[in-house]
Amino acid sequence: MENFTEQKRPLGLYDPQFEHDACGIGAVVDIKGRKSHQTVSDALSIVERLEHRAGKDAEGKTGDGVGIMLQISHRFFTKVADELNISLGNEREYGVGMFFFPQNEHLRAQAMKLFELVTRKEGLEFLAWRAVPVDPDAVGQKARDCMPSIWQCFIKKPAKVSKGIDFDRKLYIVRRVFEQASNGTYVPSLSSRTIVYKGMFLVHDLRLFYLDLQDEDYESAIGMVHSRFSTNTNPSWMRAHPNRFILHNGEINTIKGNTDAMLAREETISSPIMKEDMNKILPIINTSGSDSAMLDNALEFMVMNGMDLPLAVMITIPEPWENNKNISQKKRDFYQYYATMLEPWDGPAAILFSDGDVVGAVLDRNGLRPSRYYITKDGRMILSSEVGVLPCEPQNILVKDRLRPGKMLLVDTLKGEVVDDEKLKEYYASREPYGEWIDRNLVQLKDLKIPNVKTPSYTGDDLLRLQKVFGYKYEDISTLILPMARQGAEPSGAMGTDTPLAVLSGQHPPLFNYFKQRFAQVTNPPIDAIREKVVTSTSVYVGAHGNLLEDKPENCKVLKVHNPILTSTDLLRIKYMNVPGFKVSTVSINYYKNTSLEKAIDRVFLEVDRAYKEGANIIILSDRDIDEYHVAIPSLLAVSAVSQYLIRTKKSTALALILESAEPHEVHHFAALLGYGACAVNPYLAHETIGQLIDDGLLDKDYYAAVDDYNKAVLGGIVKIASKMGISTIQSYQSSQIFEAVGISKDVIDKYFTGTVSRVGGIGLEDIQADVEALHNAAFDPLGLDINMQLEDGGAHKFRSGKEEHLFNPQTIHLFQKACFTGDYDTFKQFTHTVDNMGRNGVHLRSLLDFNYAPDGGIPLDEVEPVSSIVKRFKAAAMSYGALSSEAHETTLHLVCRLLLE
């Protein structure tokens, strides 16, 4: 392999963005900072006992990835320096880099020369290269085939630069400049404090492969280890952990939104420490990395710009504070201040972190990953994803505990102490008067005045016409909107769907229907957002983000909204808010009929740009004022297109998007709109429809109470959808794009839904426009003929003759029941034949596929392995404990027994 930084390209159903893993983690720390080889050996012993959390190939010789982070051993590297005939100076007066170079000697020499040039250009003294002693025979053939050329470098600290973070900052700049100029070299670590040894090993291979780790002179007070289990990923040398600051077990499910926001901050962020060097280190995130690597990029950026590592972790993965009545007001103000600038990186995760001085661990707010630790009387902290990784005499154990959700465990080896979570957070919460800053700058929606302005209302034919334009069906109102307004909760329905995919439907489905909600693949059962309400947050922040790298009062000048589903009164408050620091601009997403949709979207971009240049920091995208000549861009397309445009132009953290639209009325619609960039949504037509239900006597309720209950139902549904991805905050869910598109062309996805998973092609902009204008023509007949001013019953929820096709209809249900009751196989074949014929018209993707039988009959059956042999290789276990219900487990067990399997 000649490129250790190249991202794998999507191929078939594979996409590198799916790469997550479930891993084993561990650490051993001498609390007093006493360095020894025993700590190194114990850390290696921990990872060797995590074999059950480490993946390997079918031959059992190549692993998914194992690694260790240690302090730089002055004793060991002084000995190495003597062999290289160089002088390193005192401890921490030199930096050590680990490099994965291309195997090709010419490419390696070029990369080395480039790095030396960059180092000297940045004012540092390059000392020497060292080929890292390794034993290739200790690893499997697959790992050897793609093994990089592994080297270390040594760099002298300038006299004018202080030890520690100041010197590491210079090394960080050198590495970032080199990474952007080089192609194919990966740098696992470059620091004066820490070093990373890792690769594609089995857990026992790490100690054997790197001879440095066997040397008794290699001493450290810190050892952090990681074993990788690539549940749905490809192993590689580069993706093995640790990263440069963290190692990680779990998944960051909001990663798309997190990284987009972090990259957008590059346009407005400024650093009093980096100053003119800032441009050298951008972009902040390497988007070809794994979710944990991108989190590491973000933390490294904050630390190198002057933020303490524990603080950076604390605000990136905050504890659940908003609904927790047991935390102090000072801590609440602290979290509130940073929440206005940085959305949580959410998902089930256990994270260990270190900068060479402190070692810490934190769990996600739900505690969905295991982590237990011992503190011993002889001054050591031992932590791992499970107990028993190191033998400990019971009489030597001082503390035995587990890491709590949202809590931080920290060991400071410089001070020689374990820092209590409460004490640590109170320290950071007391550094600035965050409470005063919030009181003066944070604006609450409920505190804004209601302007003396009347919003347009719709009744009778005007309301009906709008409902037809935006694709409302009678059953949408009767089975969705009415129950939600009445009960304040989503109505219950049967699981599964037997109607055609949107792209195969002939009923002009809304664009929302082309997007399918994704769910966490490496997570325990979904979060119970009802019983675990304390960990959830529905608040969003509207306005420009402050400067994360510089604490100041005006950073938190944003509008806080507790429910992103807005009433028309809420929207009026925002539209006419007269608060210094806020400017609101409304941009129409309507276009003149017969104009191309692409030109209509480009016009919206121009208007958004104009508003930004005029000082706006809140944009309201509105489809009000539809008439016979004007058509609305589908709201999801408008929101996502503008959001992607702002991300590309790095304005997404400077402008907040609010949608005022008649189109959304189902929970899925709102989830998609928030997921693709809207901060808040005002579904004015859904609210007007509730008023109609009250006027018609179908809903016996006060209008405002009914609207509040409808909004509450929508919000509850969004929280439930986010919970499937292990996400607990709407702020994190916003812009996370956790959907898969089915039936949309690659051109549309790449331009307007960038980064969305889409494994089959489909409709283009012309098709989307044709669907929208067909609905518009049904309400405003261009020929001037009479139109049917009644809402259709689309037949999506219940079978209706001549409407949406259902695989389970009166005919197929009758045949299926008859076959079951009589046991008649011919009737069953009649049932399957009927379903197959219906499917050929296109219902699911599988309906479009068939077996390609060989003309000659194929391989004779007597040459094929018998079924009784094949089934012995079936696996029937669940992926994780609790992932199957009792009923599903028992049914699977019966099946296994019937197949004569153990």
Task: Place the predicted regions along the sequence by residue.
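Glycine-rich phosphate-binding active-site loops on the catalytic face of alpha/beta enzymes
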Residues: 674-695, 752-753
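Alpha-helix-loop-beta-strand connector modules within alpha/beta enzyme cores
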Residues: 633-659, 710-714
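Short beta-alpha connecting loops at secondary-structure transitions
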Residues: 276-285, 390-396, 654-659, 688-708, ...
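Positively charged, low-complexity/disordered segments
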Residues: 890-902
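Flexible, glycine-rich loop/tail regions that form catalytic "lids" or insertion modules at the edges
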Residues: 63, 76, 285, 302-349, ...
